[in-house]
Amino acid sequence: SLRHLNAFSKEVEFLSPAQLTEKDLSNIDLRIQPWGWDRAIATYLLGINPQLEQFLPSNEALDTIRNISNRSFAACSLLPHLVSLSNDLIGDSIYFTDSHEKVMQFFNDNPALYVIKAPWSSSGRGVRYIDNRVDESNKGWMKNILEQQGGLIIEPYYNRVLDFGMEFYASEQGEIEYKGLSIFSTENRAYSGNLLANEAIKEGIVNQFVKQELLQLVQTNICSQLASAFKGKYVGNFGVDMMVVTTDDATTFKLHPCVELNLRTTMGHVALALSPTDFAPKRMMKIDYLDKYHLAINLVGDDLLDTNL
């Protein structure tokens, strides 16, 4: 049931685009925080009410946000630093800006399981999987991405045990605030839902595989590394997707500390906002699609299978 969401409705004033068009914004203290920033949303808001211009990021700022949103930023800057912190961390990523022919030569010389990512894509898209050989569909897709976006991110395929993430907020003062853990589920490699539980329960799930000290080490270093990278460039929510992986012999667990850097509000932030108090039961927030998307929040028992949420 979503009846418990009514507690938040008193804090929200809904405005239609027509109402926003007529609203006088000349003497108002306003901060706009969309799900994520890009030129499309800035142009859309400006078209609704020209007075919004003073509250919008400049074109230069939007370009900077786009550059940081490029998957190569996390792959080439954040991930290598985090992995160097401990032998219990794992993760490798290559950013190719070579010709399509050289990329194909790489796969011919190094047959294995790979994850291929476009530098920019909407959530859950722009990702392909290679199983030892590149089929014609993936060849064409990679050629198009190289031509349109100028690069490809190539990563090893890992044996995933648990998907989760850490959620943050970047302030105007250049400080990074840790908001909490996000333990989420996927279906057919796409997001499907989040566990709603207090931090102790979520930490307990992850700690079945990796120590809390390792999580704290990763969290602290994400805050310190991105504080300097984001200062004066980005203000708002962001999340870092992670995963617990196992070795080929399934005897050792390691933490991949940066599968994705999402420079926007995430469903993990939504889950944190809806998470219960310490004494409330666990819930599962699920997104289903029939004729349209549906959000459902249901109770889950203590026998929840933690690695298959």
Regions found by a protein language model. Give the residues of each.
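A short acidic (Asp/Glu
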Residues: 2-5, 41-49, 125-128, 164-165, ...
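Conserved N-proximal alpha/beta basic substrate-recognition cap immediately N-terminal to
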Residues: 2-105, 121-122
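Glycine-rich phosphate-binding loop of ATP-grasp-fold ATP-dependent ligases
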Residues: 92-96, 113-139, 165, 189-206
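Phosphate-binding site of ATP-dependent enzymes
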Residues: 111, 138-192, 239, 243-258, ...
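A short catalytic or substrate-binding loop motif that flags glycine-/basic-rich loops and adjacent residues
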Residues: 120-121, 158-162, 231-236
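ATP-dependent carboxylate/phosphate-activation module, predominantly the ATP-grasp catalytic core
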Residues: 168-226, 262-289
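Flexible, glycine/charged-enriched surface loops at secondary-structure junctions
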Residues: 229-239, 287-289
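Peripheral (often C-terminal) accessory segments that flank ATP-dependent C-N-forming ligase machineries
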Residues: 280-309
